[in-house]
Each structure stands twice: as C-alpha cells, then as structure tokens.
A protein has these predicted regions:
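Active-site pocket-lining/capping segments in soluble small-molecule metabolic enzymes
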Residues: 1-122, 136-296
Length: 296
C-alpha cells in the first residue's frame, strides 16, 4: 500500500491518474508539518472524489492536543468519522482516548506517527493491541532493526521517501533567537529558514508557526532497495511524504518504488536508482541525531 502525503492540493487530477492507494492531507487547526490543507467545506467533496477513484483519504492530525482544544478535537473526530475518511495520522495518545469514547471501533482509523519515538516492535504492538490501523516506525532505525520491528508487528508503516521530523518545540525558538541577536525584523511566521549544526554539513529546514518551531531532517530519507527485504519481512504500508519536495517529486517516487516492488531493481532506470538510493543505516543505533558519522 503506497500512501502519498501531499505537499499541496494542486493537480489533484494528476494524482488521481497516478493511483496512489491513499493520500494524506491536513485540516486546520489539528494538522502539523503539512502544506496540503483543506477545510471542512471542501473535504466532503474531496473524499467522495477520491473514493470514486479508489483512493483512500487520510487526515493529518499531528498537532498536539491541548486542554483548551480538547472539546474541539473531540468534535472534529466525530465529524471525520461520519465523513468516511479512511485514516487519521496522530502523534498524541489523547486521540486514542477520544476514539475510544466516541466508539471503540473507530480506533481502527488511527495511524500512530510519533516520529522518532516508535523504536521497537513491542512499541508498535502496544498500539496495535489498542486497535489502531497502523504504527509508523522511527526513521533512525537500521535495516535489521526495521525488519525485526516488522516481524514483531506486521501492521507497521514506514516512511520510504521524504523529509522526517527532527525536532518539535512549542517554543518560538526562531523568533527568540532573532530577537536575541537584535534582528527581530528578520522573523516571519511560516517562513522557511535553514539551520546548520556545528558537527553536520547539511542544512535542516526550519520554520515557526502557531504550533511552535519545526525542524526537519537535513536530507531526504530513502528506503531504497531495502524496501524489498522489508516487504519480505511483512511490511505492507509505504509512505511517501512530499512536504517541501512537491507533489511531482512524490509521484516520481511513487513510480520508482512501484517499479522496484513489482519488477525488481533491474527494472529501474539509472535516474530512478540514484533518486531512491537508500539512506537506511546498516549499523544498529537509536541515537542518529547526535552522530556526525556512521555506516550506511
């Protein structure tokens, strides 16, 4: 199952023609780390159009649940369940309680995506036992660790292409920093900046919005050819995140990975092989963020 997390809502007909198994988009104010945002008036028609094309619709609900918004989250969950969406990406465990209170059967809508926190098959199995649809694994696991997780919990999901979340903070880190260096006029909410650590060469995309500060990985994650042994281990859900890369890039990734899984590595063009060259680590460690070297 290929899931395409959109970067925008443009060219939806092109996306329909490409036939991903599912798309992911956001709805304010419950989403995070997405630019493909719809509203309550447009969403029902969009769900119907995608369902007519045989494409599932999943909703990004990755913003944290604050007590002041608990009632709004509860009402939004009910609306989405009645609307017939196919999945809800969540990072806050509070959504499990909301789903259980609404109707225990709706726990099957939840796809747990806590970014770097889901590091073992046991973690994933816990959420699977609650009745959730899928559990998105950490992006910093080695090939062997990922295979072990999938064998323990076959309902796991993996980001196979795209930026991943490096850090989230409710604090206004960018605005505070620019104020501290006496350049407050350089701050703009939602503007994309880059951040470079002293011990790393890459530049990490960073922005600040009403939710706080978001930092993404300095490089695009690629599962590459390791998706083949992961599929052999039982992995069935592959997510492509188009954020900052664009929907066209996502469709190129979709085509390449479909070719890889259906026809094998030899069927890939040289350009495709280069584009999806794996960034999965070979050695085992859960602390990639603090390392400036390693063996892939």
């Amino acid at each position: 199952m290929f899931i395409l997390a959109l970067d925008s809502l443009e060219d939806l007909e092109t996306i329909i023609e490409a036939r991903p198994d599912a798309i992911v988009l956001g709805i304010e104010p419950f989403c995070a780390r997405t630019r493909a945002v719809t509203d309550w008036n447009q969403l029902p028609a969009l769900v119907r159009r995608m369902h007519e094309a045989g494409i599932q619709v999943c909703i990004n609900l990755l913003a944290m649940i604050e007590q002041s918004r608990l009632q709004a989250c509860t009402e939004a969950f009910g609306q989405l369940a009645k609307m017939g969406v196919d999945g809800l990406y969540v990072a806050d465990d509070g959504w499990l309680e909301i789903a259980y209170a609404y109707n225990p059967e709706t726990l099957s809508l939840l796809i747990v995506q806590p970014e770097t926190l889901l590091c073992s098959g046991e973690d994933a199995s816990f959420f699977a036992r609650q009745g959730t649809q899928a559990q998105s694994l950490s992006h910093e696991l080695s090939e062997a660790e990922l295979i072990a997780c999938v064998k323990t919990c076959p309902s796991c999901e993996l980001l196979c292409a795209g930026h991943y979340s490096w850090m989230e903070s409710r604090r206004g880190l960018l605005s505070n920093y620019l104020h501290q260096i006496e350049k407050p006029e350089d701050f703009q909410e939602g503007r994309l900046y880059t951040l470079r650590e002293m011990n790393r060469h890459g530049r990490m995309p960073v922005w600040q919005d009403h939710l706080g500060t978001h930092v993404l990985s300095d490089e695009v994650f690629q599962a590459g050819e390791y998706l083949l042994p992961l599929r052999e281990a039982g992995l069935q859900r592959y997510r492509i995140d188009c954020l900052l890369m664009g929907n066209t890039w996502g469709l190129d990734m979709l085509k390449a990975y479909r070719t890889l899984l259906t026809e094998g590595t030899d069927a890939l063009s040289p350009k495709q092989k280069e584009a999806i060259s794996s960034t999965i680590w070979k050695s085992s460690s859960l602390i990639r963020k603090e390392k400036s070297h390693g063996t892939r």
